[in-house]
A protein has these predicted regions:
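Residues lining hydrophobic/aromatic ligand-binding pockets adjacent to catalytic sites
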Residues: 1-130
C-alpha cells in the first residue's frame, strides 16, 4: 500500500470489503508503508480478519518481523536505499536467523532490491538448501 494509506477504520473496512469481494478465503498479506499500521489495535484487527502484515526491510520503516495468522513474509527492499541495495552476507544471515527463530507455518523472504538481487538471491538459496 502507498504511504498515504494510513491506519483508519475506513481503510481497515476497505481491506475487509476487498477481501470479501475478491472471495479471498485464504490468508492475505499486505505491505503497509506507513507505520500507523504497526500498533496493537490494528494488528489484532488485521489478524481477526485474516490479513497478515508483510515485514519489510527498507529505509525509514520499522524493522519488525510480523507473525500474523501463522505467516511470516519478509520483503527486502534495501536497508539504506529503496531497490538499489546490495545486502552484505552478514545482513542476510541476521535476517534469516531472526525469521528462523520465529514459529510460523509459512515463512518467506522475498528480495526486491533490484540491483543486488542476483548475488543476494544466490546466497539465500545456498543457505536455505543447505
Amino acid at each position: 500500500m502507498p504511504s498515504s494509506f494510513k491506519y483508519t477504520q475506513d481503510n481497515l473496512d476497505r481491506l475487509t470489503t476487498f477481501k470479501k469481494k475478491a472471495d479471498l478465503d485464504s490468508k492475505v498479506i499486505v505491505e503497509f508503508r506507513d507505520a500507523s499500521w504497526w500498533n496493537k489495535t490494528s494488528i489484532a484487527q488485521l489478524e481477526n480478519i485474516k490479513i497478515s502484515i508483510c515485514s519489510v526491510d527498507a529505509p525509514l520503516l520499522p524493522k519488525k518481523i510480523f507473525n500474523l495468522n501463522n505467516t511470516i513474509y519478509f520483503r527486502l527492499h534495501g536497508s539504506k536505499s529503496w531497490y538499489n541495495y546490495l545486502y552484505f552476507e552478514k545482513e542476510i544471515k541476521k535476517i534469516m536467523d531472526k525469521v528462523e527463530k520465529k514459529t510460523a507455518n509459512i515463512k518467506a523472504i522475498y528480495l526486491n532490491n533490484d540491483h543486488g538481487m542476483l548475488p543476494n538471491g544466490k546466497y539465500l538459496l545456498e543457505h536455505v538448501l543447505n
